[in-house]
Amino acid sequence: MAREKAASRKKKERKNILNGIAHIRSTFNNTIVTITDASGNAISWSSAGSQGFKGSRKSTPFAAQVAAEIAAKKAMEHGVQNIEVYVKGPGSGREAALRALQAAGFNITVIKDVTPIPHNGCRPPKRRRV
């Protein structure tokens, strides 16, 4: 006997949020763009991996640009117009994602680098020998 679906997904309602915060997390392997409201609740997100890039292609600036465009498009459907941008991490997709958010038509009010820098905390991983 085939069972019916337990619970159907609730339709996403359109949130009317004017001001948002874009968090760009750019690592050496991937770039994740999350757009939240002022209290930190996620409105939309996207990453290079979720857009179909695999392996070393995830770490390219083009993949970061595509991820930022998709996240921006989803956020604009919820009415976001002004954003603050917080960039974190050393990856190659930082500037590309930032440029994609500007090109999407957002009014960017603040650009802030929030990369965590240790005051001589944990020992870093050993140097690669290639």
Swiss-Prot record:
GO biological process, one term: translation
MF annotations from Gene Ontology: rRNA binding; structural constituent of ribosome
Keyword list, A-Z: Ribonucleoprotein, Ribosomal protein, RNA-binding, rRNA-binding
InterPro entries recorded: Ribosomal_uS11, Ribosomal_uS11_bac-type, Ribosomal_uS11_CS, Ribosomal_uS11_sf
Gene3D superfamilies, alphabetized: Ribosomal protein S11
Cellular component GO terms held in the UniProt record: ribonucleoprotein complex; ribosome
Its biological purpose: Located on the platform of the 30S subunit, it bridges several disparate RNA helices of the 16S rRNA. Forms part of the Shine-Dalgarno cleft in the 70S ribosome.
Protein family: Belongs to the universal ribosomal protein uS11 family.
Alphabetical list of HAMAP family matching this protein: Ribosomal_uS11
Subunit structure, interactors included: Part of the 30S ribosomal subunit. Interacts with proteins S7 and S18. Binds to IF-3.
Protein's recorded name: Small ribosomal subunit protein uS11
The organism of origin for this protein: Syntrophobacter fumaroxidans (strain DSM 10017 / MPOB)
Gene name of the encoded protein: rpsK
